[in-house]
Amino acid sequence: MTIAVGRAPAGRGWFDVLDDWLKRDRFVFVGWSGLLLFPCAYMALGGWLTGTTFVTSWYTHGIASSYLEGCNFLTAAVSTPADSMGHSLLLLWGPEAQGDFVRWCQLGGLWAFVALHGAFGLIGFMLRQFEIARLVGIRPYNAIAFSGPIAVFVSVFLMYPLGQSSWFFAPSFGVAAIFRFLLFLQGFHNWTLNPFHMMGVAGILGGALLCAIHGATVENTLFEDGDGANTFKAFEPTQEEETYSMVTANRFWSQIFGIAFSNKRWLHFFMLFVPVMGLWTSSIGIIGLALNLRAYDFVSQELRAAEDPEFETFYTKNILLNEGLRAWMAPADQPHENFIFPEEVLPRGNAL
């Protein structure tokens, strides 16, 4: 009698087949994250290119915003929906457009389309970094760092208008449109005096400074291990030895500042921490603006400036500038409100 000892082959279902195909080694890795990333990124970019090329903002903002109307790259934009649309998702088949594509574009449906697909596309890109890090066998700090840009995008384009009356008050997708939004935040929220904005500026500019210092220090302390005109060709990705002298760099900065990094791991974590923390804190600040929270109001200075014409500080000057931004900007920015301000209430500088 013959006895066969072995393990029955496990049945492979459709999930295993799909998992193998998604994770196959190819020029552009797909992965499970790609099922979210690639369609959403394609839709967001395609919607933005379509909107900036063909779609007007006449019905939502009373302005031209496309190449077809004469705008250029800096002035074209996919504009936010009309204020009357509230926080509707503006689905093409929804009650606002009722399947009419042209009407959907006129109402600002492309903005909601680009914003939502863009947000999920960014999340898909972060998941892509998680997925590849796990497959390669490294830690997922790239994905954690990318949470900073995601937090900024979601807070600025989604959370802020959700706290306001409608999507209308979100930034439109365009260069000059973003500049308009920055002026709006300053005029209506005094954003530059917000401590979360200050932390964001410190993080981003501090990160740029750290990047420049680190790159320059490494270039300064490269080992002279090549005969070429430059040292770039002397480096091999698989070499075991160091390519620059950490000891020399530490000695240099110890002489400059009296203190210096002596641990490469702590140094690079600090370079990760500073800009990402700046992005996170600025995102928290934007959510505060969505709720119309005030930051620093130095009322005592405002009261004294109102009583004493000779008393003025940079704070009181900025408050007057903000009033000017609101008074001059609102009629042009919100034409549907039909704001009409009498000449005597419009703030003017001393020179006028």
From Swiss-Prot:
Its main location: membrane. It catalyses: 2 a plastoquinone + 4 hnu + 2 H2O = 2 a plastoquinol + O2. Its EC number is 1.10.3.9. Pfam families: Photo_RC. The D1/D2 heterodimer binds P680, chlorophylls that are the primary electron donor of PSII, and subsequent electron acceptors. It shares a non-heme iron and each subunit binds pheophytin, quinone, additional chlorophylls, carotenoids and lipids. There is also a Cl(-1) ion associated with D1 and D2, which is required for oxygen evolution. The PSII complex binds additional chlorophylls, carotenoids and specific lipids. GO terms for biological process: photosynthetic electron transport in photosystem II. The keyword rRNA-binding does not apply. It comes from the Bacteria. GO terms for molecular function: chlorophyll binding; electron transporter, transferring electrons within the cyclic electron transport pathway of photosynthesis activity; iron ion binding; oxygen evolving activity. The keyword Magnesium applies. Chlorophyll a ChlzD2 binds at H117. 2 of the reaction center chlorophylls (ChlD1 and ChlD2) are entirely coordinated by water. One of its GO terms (cellular component) is plasma membrane-derived thylakoid membrane. The gene is psbD1. This is Photosystem II D2 protein. It comes from Synechococcus sp. (strain RCC307). PSII is composed of 1 copy each of membrane proteins PsbA, PsbB, PsbC, PsbD, PsbE, PsbF, PsbH, PsbI, PsbJ, PsbK, PsbL, PsbM, PsbT, PsbX, PsbY, PsbZ, Psb30/Ycf12, peripheral proteins PsbO, CyanoQ (PsbQ), PsbU, PsbV and a large number of cofactors. It forms dimeric complexes. Fe cation binds at H214, H268.
